[in-house]
Every structure is written in C-alpha cells, then in structure tokens.
Amino acid sequence: MWVDSQIVMEDLEVFSNLDYLQWEKLRNKRILITGATGLIGSTLLKALMYVNKSKNLKLSLVALVRDKDKAESKFCDILRDTKELSFIVGQVEDLPDNIGKIDYIIHGASPTASDYFMKRPVETIKTAIIGTMNLLELAKEKQVDGMVYLSSMEIYGSPRNEEKLSEKDVGYIDPLVVRNCYPEAKRQCEAMCVAYANEYSVPVMSARLAQTFGPGVDSQDKRVFAEFARCAMQGKDIELLTDGSSKRCYLYTMDAVSGILTILLKGTSGNAYNVANEDTYCSIYEMAQEVAKNFANDTISVEILNDSEAQKKYPPAHFLNLDVKALIQLGWKPTKTLMEMYGRMIHQME
C-alpha cells in the first residue's frame, strides 16, 4: 500500500468508513480534479484512491495538471499501485480537448498565497474567472452528475462583528484594494455557478472553505499556520505582522475532503455551503499563544510587530465566524480540534 504515514492511514481509514457519504454514487464513475497537486486536491485524490481500493468502486480519477513530471513524482506510489489515476496536461484557462467522459468535477485550481494576490492580481482573477467558466462549460457539455467549486470564506469580506455567518450573509469587500482580487474573483465564480445551475441545469455547488491545514502541508508553506508550526518546532518566537485580532474558523484537511464530497453527493444545485469546524473559531493571536503553549512548552513568546508595509498583504481585521448548519444537516461533521490539526501537521513536518 502506498500510504507511508500512520497519521495519514488513520485519516484514510476514518474517511473510508464515513456512513453519511453515498459511496455507491461513485461506482464506475470518472472524476475530474483540478488543483490536484495542492494541499486539498492532493488529499482528496489520495482519499478517493484509497476508498476506491477498499470498496472496489471501480471509479477512475483524472487530474488536470500543469506539470506532469511534478504530478507523477508526487503520486508515484499511487501510480505504481493502480491504473485508475491518470493525468492530463493543461491549465484551467485553456482546457485541452482530450479530457474525455466525465461524471463529476471538483474544481480546486486556484492561487492561495497572499504574496501572489498582491504581485499577480490580473493572473489571480484570470485563473479564477476564465478557469471556472471553462469548467462550467465542460460540466454542461459532459452533462455531469455533479460539480463542486472550491470557494473560500474570504467571500464574506471583513465583517466587523462576531455574529455567525450563514450562506445568506454578505460582507463588505473594497474592490479598490489590490489584494481583494482574490475574494472578488471567488464571489464572481460563485455567481457563475448559480447562473449555470439556473440557465443550463448544471448540478453545481460551491464549498466555502475555512483555512485548511493538516498532514500534507509543505514545510516551506508561507501561510500563517505553517509559520506558527515552524516556530514551535525550531524554538523561535512567533512574530505577528498584524495585531492578530482577526478571528476565523479553521478546517482539518480530511474534514475538508469529507465536506467537499458531502456537497458533491448530497448538496442542492446552485447552493453554497460553509465548510469549517465552528469550535476552532479564535483570533490569530490566540492561536499563536496556543501553539506556543502546546508545542513549545511555553519556551517561546508571541510578539506583535505591527509591520504596516507587510499588513498590505493581509485583509483588514475581520471576524469570520462561520455557521455550518446547512452542511451538518446533510450529515457531515468535523473530526479534529485546532490543536489536533496542529499536532498532526507538525508530526508530518518533522
């Protein structure tokens, strides 16, 4: 078996035994994944390949990738074990013609780094808008059984109070701020999904994911959760470039995967669903303190630098307290606390 980590094996076993997922809907189906080499996409791919083997579903996965050599290297153990995973070289902005029959689409291709949003806002928008339009056209052409667009909790903008945010709530986003190219593009992509669902009866849903991490995070990842983990592992003080007052929910990688598949198999076309662990809601400063306490035995401190230039990379102070009731009503539930997420991520990084 190609699983070389006890933690990942535990996650896959739990995932494959989730009784609220309608596995039979995937039998003999062909699933297209974009963004398959990213954190969520790669976890999703591994999870589906594991379930396919354990339940003999005879499903096949095709991943759209920019760099086939990179993808084959990343998933070499799976490729040695099965013929039911294949790669198509291309990009979402210009889909290749050789995709073939598709039953389900999970569209996760997207930049995720704040630095990239600031330096390449045009490319951020083009990847989102053109890519999603192309995938929706493909879904219409192939008459797929279902499609999920991976959106973000950032579409809620910068709420100034801590009230729960349901899928019906909207927040303020200033389109004149360069970094907001990302949430504005995500909003437009969700609107396109609704348009295709209504005009062409494409069975498409959006998953509004909280910030997601766990096993599989690259040790050089620049996002704040990975930086906190590295500081704890190296015994370095955690330095915050903002005051750390923003509060949000988080999500474990495998919980993200189970949420996405719940939406794909049980969601209502045209709807969006929050995907988060409500119990993880905390400020960035509070999270830093908990990491220092739990993984560095309080031997490191949390310092607030308040770097005004660096702050331009980040959204203004906000409170993203997601209400996950709609997804829970479909049977989904998260499995890992915030510190469990950190523990499993750090174990993989070591």
Residue ranges and their predicted role:
Residues R30-Y50:
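N-terminal Rossmann NAD(P)H-binding glycine-rich loop of SDR-like oxidoreductase domains
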Residues P111-D115, M153-R160, A210-F213:
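Active-site segment of SDR-like NAD(P)-dependent oxidoreductases
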